[in-house]
Amino acid sequence: MSRGIIIIGSGFAARQLVKNIRKQDAHVPLTLIAADSMDEYNKPDLSHVISQSQRADDLTRQLAGEFAEQFNLRLFPHTWVADIDADAHVVKSQDKQWQYDKLVLATGATAFVPPIAGRELMLTLNSQQEYRACETQLRDAQRVLIVGGGLIGSELAMDFCRAGKTVTLMDNAASLLASLMPPEVSSRLQHHLTDMGVHLLLKSQLQKLEKTEAGIRATLVSQHSIEVDAVIAATGLRPETALARRAGVVVNRGVCVDSYLQTSHPDIYAIGDCAEINGQVLPFLQPIQLSAMYLAKNLLGGNAPLKLPAMLVKVKTPELPLHLAGETQRRDLSWQITAESDGMIAKGMSGEGQLRAFVVSEDRMKEAFALLKTLSV
C-alpha cells in the first residue's frame, strides 16, 4: 500500500503543489504537516494591511478544513516536526510519526532580525501569524522605523506613510533596492517616497534599541538617535533549513535541489522560499508556481526538469509601482533610462549590446511583456 506524499509546510508553495498533484492524481495519499493553523492567506497582502485597515483575520481566504475537503488531504496543523529519518522514510513530531514514499520540504523562510542590543523590540511581518501578534501595536503606532530598504521595506514604508504615520526607512546601502538595481534606476522610487514624507536614513546602521517612557529609542552607529513607537525588521529572509540538516540533506543558503527539485536524498524534495535551485534562491511567486507544476509531475513518476523563463518581479508600491526582470543587480551593465511623467523605462545593456535587464514603472509597465521577449537570458 502506498504511504503517499508528505508535505511539510502550508504556504503558497505547498498549496500550489497540492493543486498540481490533484490535477494529475485524485487518489494518491497526501498529508500536510505545519506549525501554523494552515488557513490560507495571500502573503503579499501583508505589504498593504495598514493603509487598508485590515486585521490579521481579514486576510484569511480559506479555512484549513475546507482546503482538506476540497483536495482530499490529511492535515496536521499546529504540529512541529521534530525530526526526519530519511533512511526509514519517517517524519516525527513530539508525539506522532508518519511514513512516506516521497517527502517535500516547503518550510519557507524566516525574517532575519539583526543581532543588536534590544532586537527583541523589533517586529517582523513575514506571516499572518506574525502580523496577528503585533497588529494592535502597529495600528496604534504613529512613529514607525523600518530597518531595511529592500523590496519589503520599501513597500511597507509607502504603506505606513499612506496610512498617515511618520515613517523612517533605514538601510546600510546608499540607495533603496540596492541588491536589486543600481541607484540611477531606483532613484525614481526613492524621490517619490521622500516627497510623500518618508524620512530616509541611508548609509546608516542600527546599533541598539531601548524601551523608553515615550516608546523606543533607536540609536545608530553614528550615535544619532530617534524616538519611535514601533520598529520593523525588513532586512531579508533566511531559508528555513534546520529540518533538512537534521535529515542529512545538503544545504547551503537554502535546501539544495537540482532541476527536478530533488535534494541530495532521492526521496526528499524542496520547493518555495526554503529551496536553493541549482544555486539560486528564488522567493517569488512565479518561480514557485512553475516549480509546483514540475515537481507534481516528478512526484508522480515523471522526469521533468524545471525550466525557468525570464520572469517579472513586481515591487508593490502602489503610488509608483515597478516591474523588473533579468540580471538587474549586475554591476557591469550600461543603463539606458527614459523617464517621462507617465513612467520610466530603464534598460540594462551588456557590452555586446544585448538587453540583459530592465525596470519599468507606472504606465510604462505595459511594455514589460514586449521587453521580456527580447531579454537575453
From Swiss-Prot:
Reactions this protein catalyses: 2 reduced [nitric oxide reductase rubredoxin domain] + NAD(+) + H(+) = 2 oxidized [nitric oxide reductase rubredoxin domain] + NADH
Pathway info: Nitrogen metabolism; nitric oxide reduction
Q: Which HAMAP family match?
A: NorW
User: What is its cofactor?
Assistant: FAD
Subcellular location(s) per record:
Cytoplasm
> Entry's NCBIfam families?
PRK04965.1
EC top class, as a word: oxidoreductase
Name used for this protein in its record:
Nitric oxide reductase FlRd-NAD(+) reductase
Give the protein's function.
Answer: One of at least two accessory proteins for anaerobic nitric oxide (NO) reductase. Reduces the rubredoxin moiety of NO reductase.
Gene Ontology molecular-function annotations: oxidoreductase activity, acting on iron-sulfur proteins as donors, NAD or NADP as acceptor
| Keywords tagged on the record | Cytoplasm, FAD, Flavoprotein, NAD, Oxidoreductase
EC number(s) reported in the record: 1.18.1.-
Matching InterPro entries: FAD-bd_OxRdtase (IPR050260), FAD/NAD-bd_sf (IPR036188), FAD/NAD-binding_dom (IPR023753), NO_rdtase_NorW (IPR023961), Rbx-bd (IPR041364)
Q: Name one Pfam family in it.
A: Rbx_binding
**Family per UniProt?**
Belongs to the FAD-dependent oxidoreductase family.
Q: Which gene is the coding source of this polypeptide chain?
A: norW
